[in-house]
Regions:
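N-terminal Lys/Arg-rich, disordered targeting/topogenic segments
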Residues: 1-10
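Hydrophobic membrane-insertion alpha-helices, especially the h-region
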Residues: 14-30
Length: 385
């Protein structure tokens, strides 16, 4: 009798457990097939849940930025969590971004499109480029990613066009491999480099990090990576990839007002070590490194400049290197000049740098990318002869 009762209890338990598993599995399938994207609320704004992977101080500053500009920029929905890098572009996506800059000009700036490949990196809207003898690899942050402009208008894409147009033979043609992502630091650059096996003799590698390295944070990028890839970190991370679980996590209010000691995502000494290691790694493969600083200030810019001098490699500092072009921009880029002048109006007269920058005074716009390509091309042309 007792044994029969025990069997009944076990059957009841198994039935209940199976029902629960089936229910949650069904909900998970519905979420995934419907394209459901969990979000958490900050004031009146819905922020995609993958951003929970960010350092809490970085996330808090983004929330404050959103509240200040009055909307969540559409491009943040192009990303997903990634165990190695924290996040990457969703694979095989195509998204057109319309609201992405200052609220004062959000309806006046042209839209731009983000297209990714199977590995979660940005590519041309026409698909992967054909294989050439040489490659230009770009490891950088949002400016090298081309935030705010189409892929074909980024400085690296325009640079490859110029190099190939001036090449004496097809063996001197380059293909572009842009592995840059917004928010990436030199630490994530070293992680990228460890997986970058296609670099070969005669290639060029642009390294462009600094702004995100110096950004305030609660933990360093290295600490974030080690925590995420510890045993418990991997368990928690894999749980967060279950949409139903991630959706339930969004019910709690996000933390705010975090107290933290002053620190940066990548301390200056680590920044130096990362850049030096990247430069040496490029040279070991027979490729040619170039350091490009965009919106990289103070001691981080000085460090990048010193490394370039010590290693005897080209160094470019943007946007200051573009200032000499200000008097001729309207002749070089007449259509784009009109577009941005109509967007900024008197603001461009008060701040001429808006001719080639977005309102954040940091990211290059289409004109800025065009000028950067011209400046870089002159150096590349001399070095490739």
């Amino acid at each position: 009798m007792a044994q029969q009762k025990r069997k009944k209890i076990i059957r009841s338990f198994l039935f209940s457990a199976t029902t629960v598993i089936f229910f949650f599995g069904f909900v998970e399938l519905v979420f995934r097939f419907s394209g459901f994207e969990p979000v958490f609320q900050y004031k009146a704004y819905a922020i995609p849940s993958w951003m929970e992977e960010l350092d809490p101080v970085v996330l808090e500053k983004y929330q404050q930025f959103v509240a200040g500009q009055g909307f969540v920029n559409e491009d943040v929905y192009a990303y997903e969590a990634d165990l190695r890098y924290g996040y990457k572009l969703k694979p095989n996506i195509s998204i057109t971004v319309r609201n992405y800059s200052s609220a004062y000009v959000v309806d006046k700036l042209p839209p731009w499109t983000v297209v990714s490949n199977t590995k979660g990196f940005r590519v041309s809207s026409s698909g992967e480029a054909k294989t050439e003898e040489k490659s230009l690899h770009v490891l950088g942050d949002s400016s090298s990613f081309g935030w705010g402009v189409d892929y074909e208008k980024t400085y690296s894409s325009l640079l490859v066009e110029k190099l190939n147009a001036s090449a004496s033979s097809s063996s001197d043609h380059f293909e572009l491999r842009n592995l840059s992502l917004p928010g990436f630091s030199s630490f994530q650059g070293t992680l990228l480099w460890q997986e970058l096996g296609e670099v070969k003799n005669g290639d060029w590698v642009i390294l462009s990090f600094g702004w995100n390295d110096s950004f305030p944070s609660y933990q360093t990028d290295r600490q974030q990576f080690e925590s995420r890839n510890s045993l418990m970190g991997k368990i928690n991370w894999n749980l967060r990839q279950i949409l139903f679980f991630r959706w339930m996590r969004t019910w709690r209010l996000p933390e705010s007002g975090l107290e933290y000691k002053a620190g940066s995502r990548v301390p200056l000494t680590q920044y130096r070590e990362n850049l030096e290691a990247l430069v040496e790694g490029v040279r070991e493969k027979g490729a040619k490194p170039v350091l490009v600083s965009v919106c990289n200030f103070a001691e981080y810019q000085d460090t990048a400049r010193q490394i370039a001098g010590n290693k005897n490699i080209p160094f470019f500092n943007f946007p200051s290197s573009l200032e000499p072009f200000l008097p001729t921009v309207h002749d070089r880029f007449p259509d784009q000049f009109v577009t941005y002048f109509e967007a900024y109006g008197e603001g461009m007269e008060a701040d001429p740098m808006l001719v080639f920058l977005f309102p954040d005074r940091c990211h290059p716009n289409e004109i800025g990318h065009g000028l950067m390509a011209e400046v870089l091309f002159e150096t590349f042309k001399r070095k490739t002869r």
